[in-house]
Amino acid sequence: MSVPKAKALLTVCAALLLCGCGQALSEREIVRAVFFARQQGAYSACLLLADQNAESDGVQYKTVSARGDTAAQALHLAEDALPGRLYYGLLDLAALPPGCDWADAQTLGTLLYDKAQPAPELSVFVLDTADHSWAADAASLYEDMKAVEREYDLHCGLQQLFTQADGCAVPGYRTDSGYDFYLLAKDAPARRVSGLPAQLAAVLCGQADNFFSAYHDGQALCKSEVNVTVEDTAVQLHLRDCTLQSLADADDDLQGFLCAELQHAFAALTHDAKADFFHLQFWHENLYGVGREAPAPTLAVVFE
């Protein structure tokens, strides 16, 4: 077979794979987001789909949802309610149910991975506890979560649910501003942090690289690029282009208050941690060998 013919055949095969073995993408149900909730012992699953028949200035999404005894059953019933064949290749957001723990995250993550692998653009949130109507709220929830990702340069990929054997960390959606952060350890209750501690946790987990948060009891605002360096368990937090703004009349020591709050948050996040969320034990064992107990973590805040 000549080289041009081989290239043409490969192109045709790739096109068939992308469109679903000959079925045009425009004829399929394109899934953009999957939401899970848990109510009264049962699961609810909602698929947010691209509405390819919508007018350009109208609503661009449609939804289908179902309830089941398990998350897999609820998702399967929602899929069965659609007349067309589903396409998960453009799925870029999944919301885990509020109150989920590590085991739930593993189960739902595996279910999503089976549907959308390798899904490099798929991001994960934990849904808030509000009582949402899927038909009325799913599209706005999707847009809000994607906006939070852009504004805070935040991303938790699906693969990050599986990078550690004893825990994972996931940002949490909130309706006002910013985001929460969930530390989900194996065989332990979920832990949620908010505000500046949530953003510090996201930075330490490698899921964000900036701060944009109120602190000092809401009297000051910090906006900064952040980089983390680690030597053994000594963490350095490098703040670049840092802007500290007073939201009150008093001219306080804004830098001092920020450092104090970061130190307090770091101590709380690393005290009696049920999993190595910030990889400090991992780096210590790489330096000194497996099984060596790591010293207490320390934090230094550096303004650059």
Which positions does each model-derived feature cover?
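Membrane-proximal alpha-helical signals and transmembrane carboxylates
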Residues: 2-9, 18-304
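Residue-level signal for mature regions of secreted extracellular proteins and peptides
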Residues: 14-15
